[in-house]
């Protein structure tokens, strides 16, 4: 069975267990991203990438806090992509989507080169 956004959301919730603020934030960003993607009528593949990146965009916060005692965007951009890659690989996502999601997470706090 192909992975879907529900699988990503469930994995994000498991990973962020005990941090309802992170879970709620990810779900809010997902809802906004989904709405924007639908309004823009993007392709199915781009929608899957957008939704996945939205759910996982802050996945590096917890490890950043542990390693650097900070959840600054620069640390999230370092720590988030490897976590997202591991999670999405376990879910058997297509490599092209994994690579794009990781790129977007690595550029989450940068306002250029993320088209």
Task: Describe every region a protein language model picked out.
Residues 1-64, 70-73:
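Acidic/His-rich, divalent-metal-binding segments that scaffold phosphate/diphosphate chemistry
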């Amino acid at each position: 069975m192909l992975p879907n956004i529900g699988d990503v959301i469930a994995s994000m919730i498991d990973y962020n267990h005990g941090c309802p603020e992170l879970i709620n934030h990810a779900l809010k960003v997902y809802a906004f991203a989904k709405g924007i993607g639908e309004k823009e009528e993007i392709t199915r593949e781009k929608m899957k990438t957008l939704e996945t990146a939205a759910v996982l965009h802050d996945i590096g916060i917890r490890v950043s806090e542990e390693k650097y005692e900070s959840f600054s965007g620069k640390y999230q951009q370092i720590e988030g992509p490897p976590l997202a890659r591991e999670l999405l690989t376990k879910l058997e996502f297509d490599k092209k989507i994994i690579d794009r999601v990781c790129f977007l997470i690595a550029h989450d706090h940068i306002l250029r080169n993320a088209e």
